[in-house]
Amino acid sequence: ISATVWQNWGPNTANTWRQVPELAGGGFLFDTGAHMLNTVVDLAGEGFAEVAAWLDNQGRPVETLGVVMGRLQSGAWVTMHACGETIPSCASDVRVFGDRAILRTGIWGERLEIQRYGRGHLRKVSVSASLGVWEQFLAVRRGEMPNPCPPEVGLRMAALYDAIRASSEDGGRPVRVQPEEAS
C-alpha cells in the first residue's frame, strides 16, 4: 500500500488552534493526515508489526511533513507521505498493489479505480451512491447494515499513530507494534 496526502495546511492553519500542540494533539498528520492513516489501516485489514517514521515541523509548532514506512503483520509493506507545505490544494492518492490488480482511491473515498492484470490502465469502479454520513450512522445504529468501519480499525489507527510518534521521536528508529495494539 502506498498513500500520499498533500495540502497547504501549514500556511492555512498558522496562528490557529490547529497549530497549538496542547489543543490539537498533533499537526498535519494528526489532522488531514488522519484520514490517510484511517484509509490505509482500513484497506490493510490488519495491524502493523513495525513502523519507522520521520516528522518535520518546518519551523512550526507542530509537524507539517511526514514519511512513514511500515510492515504489516502479514509482512506486506506500506509507505505513507504527508506534505502540509505545498501549493493551495488538498488532495490524496492511495494505491494498493497486488499481483492480480492495482487499486487506486483517495483518503475520502472520492474515487475507486482498478487496473487488472494484463490491462493497460486504471478503470473507474462503479459503486453505490453514499447514504451520507448521518444516514449511514443511523442505519448502522438501527441494525440495518453492518458497521463499515468497526472500532477495531480505530484501535489499529491509534496504535499506528503512537508508533509513528515513537519512531519519529527516536530519529526514525523502527518501532515494533505489540500484537494486542495492532490487531
Task: List the model feature ranges, each with a label.
Residues 37-111, 132-147, 163, 176-183:
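Contiguous beta-strand/loop segments that form the cofactor/metal-binding neighborhood of enzyme cores
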Residues 2-7, 102-105, 113:
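Mobile, glycine-enriched helix-loop/loop "lid" segments at the mouths of ligand-binding/catalytic clefts
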Residues 122-125, 140-157, 172-174:
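Glycine- and charged-residue-rich phosphate/anionic-cofactor binding loop of Rossmann-like
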